[in-house]
């Protein structure tokens, strides 16, 4: 009969989607990171807002709930979003760009396997990229620090681009 958990949206639309400033910012980020649609950007923005909200709640919470801080900081450090010496106050400074930089699509592009984020997206969706020995077909996969060195490309075009970059 299905899962008994409550299904929630994984993104939040902007309050004023047709505001000029919001449109310019979303178009800039979507173009730079090669996102397919605005929903991908909203999903990453929702993640950043979620962790900022948790940080605000923990700052206001009594000392007896300080044990909740450590796992959240460790998770974001493993993803490479926070530095090793991060504190709870650093959670308040999270931005969408920090999450977009940790997507598999962006990392494949930055490593030089692809000439553009759009080419990186195509390589991933066609199954030419492996992370830690597993084929991953989601461009939005958030890459952990320990997995970053284990990204490999199985397509000959990756090798050509890699030679051009070096």
UniProtKB/Swiss-Prot annotation:
One GO MF term: rRNA binding
Presence of keyword Ribonucleoprotein: yes
Gene3D superfamilies: RNA-binding S4 domain
Keywords associated with the record: Ribonucleoprotein, Ribosomal protein, RNA-binding, rRNA-binding
Tagged with keyword rRNA-binding: yes
Domain S4 RNA-binding: residue ranges: 102-164
InterPro entries recorded: Ribosomal_uS4, Ribosomal_uS4_arc, Ribosomal_uS4_euk/arc, Ribosomal_uS4_N, S4_RNA-bd, S4_RNA-bd_sf
One of the GO BP terms on file: ribosomal small subunit biogenesis
Chain's role: One of the primary rRNA binding proteins, it binds directly to 16S rRNA where it nucleates assembly of the body of the 30S subunit. With S5 and S12 plays an important role in translational accuracy.
Entry's family note: Belongs to the universal ribosomal protein uS4 family.
Subunit structure and binding partners: Part of the 30S ribosomal subunit. Contacts protein S5. The interaction surface between S4 and S5 is involved in control of translational fidelity.
Record-given protein name: Small ribosomal subunit protein uS4
